[in-house]
């Protein structure tokens, strides 16, 4: 509302939320350590998925932070300046409303 733009902060907050969500999903998908230990191939596949997920999240976080830093150097977004240039929306004049009619045989009221 003021002169500050919160657009640059949204990608980092969104990336943190996505990071928490995906790390929770990845942690719940991992096998428990107290289970059978003879499943080396399953653990290798899980480790590969985890590495791929972490690589993707690191890339995505870097991309989101580059996006937010580039908008900070541009001097704001053009949409914000267009909004500030427009006059505020004018509301139509308030009309006198008739009182609502309550129809006892129906389940609704009629307001015109």
From Swiss-Prot:
Taxonomic lineage per UniProt? Eukaryota, Metazoa, Chordata, Craniata, Vertebrata
Subcellular localization: Secreted
Q: Which GO terms describe its cellular component?
A: extracellular space
Report the record's disulfide bonds. Answer: 100-111
GO molecular-function terms, A-Z: G protein-coupled receptor binding; neuropeptide hormone activity
Secretion signal: which residues? 1-27
Instruction: Report the function annotation for this chain.
Output: Neuropeptide with neuronal depressant and sleep-modulating properties.
- Lineage, top-rank taxon, reads Eukaryota
Which body tissues produce this protein? Interneurons in the cerebral cortex and hippocampus.
Enumerate the Pfam families for this protein. Answer: Somatostatin (PF03002)
Instruction: Please state what the protein is called.
Output: Cortistatin
GO biological process terms, alphabetically, are:
adenylate cyclase-inhibiting G protein-coupled receptor signaling pathway; neuropeptide signaling pathway; regulation of cell migration; regulation of circadian sleep/wake cycle, sleep
Keyword vocabulary terms for this entry:
Cleavage on pair of basic residues, Disulfide bond, Hormone, Secreted, Signal
The UniProt similarity line reads:
Belongs to the somatostatin family.
Heme recorded as keyword: no
Q: Where does this protein chiefly localize?
A: secreted
Species per Swiss-Prot/TrEMBL record: Rattus norvegicus
Region annotation (Disordered) maps to: 66-101
Residues forming the propeptide are 28-81
């Amino acid at each position: 509302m003021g002169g500050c733009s919160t657009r640059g902060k949204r990608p980092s907050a969104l990336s943190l939320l996505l990071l928490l969500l995906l790390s929770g999903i990845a942690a719940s998908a991992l096998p428990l350590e107290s289970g059978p230990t003879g499943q080396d191939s399953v653990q290798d596949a899980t480790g590969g998925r985890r590495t791929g997920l972490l690589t993707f999240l690191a890339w995505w976080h870097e991309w989101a932070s580059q996006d937010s830093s580039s908008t900070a150097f541009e001097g704001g977004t053009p949409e914000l300046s267009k909004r500030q240039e427009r006059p505020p929306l004018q509301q139509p004049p308030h009309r006198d409303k008739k009182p609502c009619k309550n129809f006892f045989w129906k389940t609704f009221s009629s307001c015109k």
